[in-house]
Amino acid sequence: MRWVVEYYEQADTAQPAEEFEVSLKRHHKKLGAKLRAIAAAIEVYGPQLGGGLIEPCHDYKGLWEIRTIFNGFLGRELFGFDGEQNRVVLLHGYVKRVGQPASIPDLNQASAYWIDYQHTHKISPEVPEQEEQS
């Protein structure tokens, strides 16, 4: 089965995971590139990707995280698998220094987004490549 990676969209049309990725392009380019590469691999392998690249968030039902490290920073992008729609729904992300504990507020926020997505199935509309760059 092939998975499609999509961004969760809030009722006000904000897309937290996409905003996170944009901020990575400014502040942590290599970390962002690694997260995008892992997201692309998820399209092919889904939850079987493993290898420490994706892990379920055990205390948060249905929530998974993409995990990567670069130059003393850990990037985490939180997502859920929607098996009915063959979607990987990117929800939220954060960066922390190596050795810092997981960000409970960020995990709680992503969990709330996942619950909202399960009710609304709202994702961001596709943006043509040229519009993304402007």
Where are the model-predicted features located?
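Basic, Lys/Arg-enriched alpha-helical interface segments
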Residues: 1-74, 83-87, 94-134
